[in-house]
């Protein structure tokens, strides 16, 4: 039984990028879909599409590579884990990697990128980082 499907999804994206695959499939949850949408908005993934087979949903993710066939994702890492939750206040999530990276934060207003959460003046649980 899988206890952390967000970590599983990040691992699937990381492994697909290392193997230079064009597409990978993730299990669906609203948090994962919001996280993938942030990755697409920030330019780390090309696109995504939710597929439904009966009552089972999956997310098909298209990875993005630069002109040299190198993944645009340098590192993708789970921050808050089931055994150790990490929360940051509105002042702590301002920047990550001097603006070159993105933190995904679960807030009371939904799953947001760190810059959007800072603009709204809210903090929350840091789900993952990507740069």
From Swiss-Prot:
Gene Ontology biological-process annotations: translation
Family annotation (PROSITE patterns): RIBOSOMAL_S8
GO CC annotation terms, alphabetical: ribonucleoprotein complex; ribosome
Assembly mode: Part of the 30S ribosomal subunit. Contacts proteins S5 and S12.
Organism: Sulfurovum sp. (strain NBC37-1)
Keyword Ribosomal protein attributed: yes
The protein, known as: Small ribosomal subunit protein uS8
Pfam families found in the cross-reference section: Ribosomal_S8
Gene: rpsH
GO molecular function, a single term: rRNA binding
Sorted UniProt keywords: Ribonucleoprotein, Ribosomal protein, RNA-binding, rRNA-binding
SUPFAM superfamilies named among the record's database cross-references: Ribosomal protein S8 (SSF56047)
HAMAP family per record: Ribosomal_uS8_B
Family note: Belongs to the universal ribosomal protein uS8 family.
Function in brief: One of the primary rRNA binding proteins, it binds directly to 16S rRNA central domain where it helps coordinate assembly of the platform of the 30S subunit.
Domain of life of the native organism: Bacteria
